[in-house]
Amino acid sequence: KNEVLNFLSESDALTGSLNRRGFMEKAVQINRENAGKEMVILFADLDHLKEINDSFGHIEGDFAIRRCAEVLKSAVGDSGVTGRIGGDEFCAMLPGNAGDGQRIREQVRRECDGFNSDSDKPYYVELSIGYHVIRCGSDLVISDVLKDADEALYEEKKKRRKSVKK
């Protein structure tokens, strides 16, 4: 019974991913177990969720959220951990460097593009992703690292908006 309650308290009901609490606990554990190693923290955001919900309904918005969770988990693979930490926000943590962060970001874009071209959905599923490289250790505060990755996401969103306007 305790295992079931623990699972439910750390899982996101919509996506089956870790929720914020579960992700933070797992990230702290990974940090503790990998002192001195480099890790990439990715912070991702589903683009245009409000417009999807407003135009096509919350069932479609939920579908887009689930699809984003699947795409991110697929790109990260078994070497890392992913979670949905808020409404349309996702995080991942995996061993690697900046090149790995860029590779994951590009893979997610390719998977979203593939889904969008094959889908009969009247909207696009797209994720903006920022990442931050850390060196694990006892002095690392995971919430601070997530803030840094969130700032990188914000910069990525600004760049993407500018490139779309051109």
Stretches with model-predicted labels:
Residues 50, 65, 71-73, 83, ...:
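Short beta-strand->loop micro-motif that forms the acidic, two-metal-ion catalytic signature
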Residues 81-84, 123:
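A short pre-motif secondary-structure segment
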Residues 1-3, 113:
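Regulatory sensory/coupling modules that transmit signals to nucleotide-handling catalytic cores
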Residues 5-25, 44-58, 66:
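Conserved nucleotide-binding and Mg2+-coordinating catalytic segments in signaling enzymes
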Residues 69-70, 100-119, 150:
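Alpha-helical scaffold within the catalytic cores of cyclic-nucleotide enzymes
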Residues 40-45, 82:
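Active-site-flanking beta-strand signature of metal-NTP-handling nucleotidyl enzymes
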